[in-house]
């Protein structure tokens, strides 16, 4: 397990994430979605991104960029945590909010009892320290780990959609957790552009 100081810092950081994510377990009139940035969306962070997004109570949304691997891995982040050394995949940049916190997306068929919350079909999100550690230790082959998340204030994502910045698609666990993300954005953009042209 990570050292006591690391656990304390991660637990402290999780408090702000919990503020946004705890309400995601409540029923909302919207479904999770996969956002694919359009070619015209020129932004240094969100241009050419794919974002798994979910509504939360109050009209806001939270999400995770799924195609921005970093050069950092779990072993570098937690050098004293032996299970982290076995995870070869890089950490991904989930977004610019709470970048000091590690989140885990894990594919699960059925329900979970470890505090992870459903975020999309067959996908659960863990942000509490113990739940993330458990996934690192025993489910890393079916998970992806992120630094940070995306947060939209109430109405903010609706405005971005009205401005035509995003394509919207249904999230699929296999696509969201695809190991090789090079070319994934271009693949989805081409598919969604073709779909839009047939409507």
Predicted regions and their residues:
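Bacterial N-terminal signal peptides
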Residues: 10-22
């Amino acid at each position: 397990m990570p050292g006591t100081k690391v656990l304390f810092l991660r637990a402290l950081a999780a408090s702000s994430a919990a503020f946004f994510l705890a309400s995601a377990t409540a029923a909302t009139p919207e479904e999770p979605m996969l956002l694919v940035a359009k070619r015209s969306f020129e932004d240094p962070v969100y241009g050419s991104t794919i974002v798994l997004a979910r509504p939360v109570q109050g009209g806001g949304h939270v999400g995770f960029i799924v195609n921005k691997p970093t050069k950092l891995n779990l072993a570098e982040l937690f050098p004293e945590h032996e299970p982290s050394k076995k995870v070869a995949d890089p950490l991904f940049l989930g977004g610019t909010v709470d970048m000091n916190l590690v989140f885990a997306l894990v594919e699960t068929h059925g329900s979970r009892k470890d505090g992870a919350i459903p975020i999309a079909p067959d996908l659960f999100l863990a942000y509490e320290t113990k739940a993330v550690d458990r996934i690192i230790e025993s489910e890393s082959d079916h998970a992806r780990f992120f630094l940070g998340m995306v947060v939209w204030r109430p109405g903010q994502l609706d405005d971005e959609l009205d401005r035509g910045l995003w394509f919207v698609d249904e999230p699929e666990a296999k696509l969201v957790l695809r190991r090789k993300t090079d070319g994934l954005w271009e693949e989805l953009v081409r598919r969604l552009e073709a779909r839009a042209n047939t409507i």
